[in-house]
Amino acid sequence: MEKLTPRQQMVLAFISAHLESHGYPPTLREIGGHLGINGTLGVMKHLDALERKGFITRNAGSSRGIVLVGAVAATSIPIVGVVRAGALQPAIEDIEGYFAVDRALVKGADCFFLRVKGDSMIEAGIRSGDLALVRPQATADNGDIVVARINDEATLKRFFREKDRIRLQPENSAMEPIIVKAKAGEVNIIGKVTGIFRSLE
């Protein structure tokens, strides 16, 4: 089989998760609504690609006519709120929904999504509105992109530990880093960002 693009993997994972939880495949509108695709034409293009590459077949004339070819292991990951890629903002931890992804893309247990707001990580390819897949962990290596909490406020930045301070570095040349000295406050690492998911249509 041909290799899938990340977007095609997301469509296939949602179909698999919907089949597992409901017992029948989703409609075009349900796929579009889940992935943020306006209209059915964009969804049909993804399904055409999946069928051409041998991952699905479709029964003509049926709104739920998608049939998986082989097994796809999908899992639904909770979206637990918004994290600002910019200035600090209060952490939001109420589950707002779920997003289905290929289980092979999930590295670790208890992973969750945070929706990115702001453009301080734009030069790392992380845009406002993206879903950041976060693996919970309390430590980070220099250069990791993390979700960090400072005094109950959360931010998404690149992490650096330097002598007596921690630097949370934006990936936007127009913005300054957040510097926290050891005696000025505590930085808690919520988790490491292991993937970014985006609606392309």
Swiss-Prot record:
DNA-binding region(s) from the entry: 28-48
Matching InterPro entries: LexA, LexA-like, LexA/Signal_pep-like_sf, LexA_DNA-bd_dom, LexA_repressor, Peptidase_S24_LexA, Peptidase_S24_S26A/B/C, WH-like_DNA-bd_sf
Reactions listed under catalytic activity: Hydrolysis of Ala-|-Gly bond in repressor LexA
One MF annotation (Gene Ontology) recorded for this entry: serine-type endopeptidase activity
UniProt keyword annotation of Transcription present: yes
GO biological process: DNA repair; DNA replication; negative regulation of DNA-templated transcription; proteolysis; SOS response
Enzyme type, top EC level: hydrolase
Pfam families associated with the record: LexA_DNA_bind (PF01726), Peptidase_S24 (PF00717)
Presence of the UniProt keyword DNA-binding in the record: yes
Record-stated family: Belongs to the peptidase S24 family.
Assembly information from the UniProt record: Homodimer.
Its job: Represses a number of genes involved in the response to DNA damage (SOS response), including recA and lexA. In the presence of single-stranded DNA, RecA interacts with LexA causing an autocatalytic cleavage which disrupts the DNA-binding part of LexA, leading to derepression of the SOS regulon and eventually DNA repair.
Protein name in the entry: LexA repressor
Organism field: Geotalea uraniireducens (strain Rf4)
